[in-house]
Amino acid sequence: MIISKTPLRMSFFGGGTDFADYYKNSRYGYGTVISTALDMYVYIMVCKRFDDKIRVCYTVNEFVDSVDQIKHNIIREALKMLGIEKGIDIVYSADIPLSSAGIGLASSSALAV
């Protein structure tokens, strides 16, 4: 079982200036980002199942037979990248409501950790 706790982040300045496309093509050079970690967290719990099913729990519960059936884009693509095809439980929660539209506190970045 793996459990992670990652702080959410608030950016004050420089949102996309740290992307290579910006600093390689900008006349200003490298980007500058000012942000801070918050005292609110994203929690992830991952454990092996004893069958071949995949269960993903966040604001909805997904119980599927294959990785391709997972609706949560980040989790689906992370499992594909890692070569995990079956037999896993993933629970994703946070101290704030999570939304697929984004909340501006880097919850998807925290999930990637």
Residue ranges and their predicted role:
Residues 1-109:
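ATP-binding N-lobe of GHMP and related small-molecule kinases
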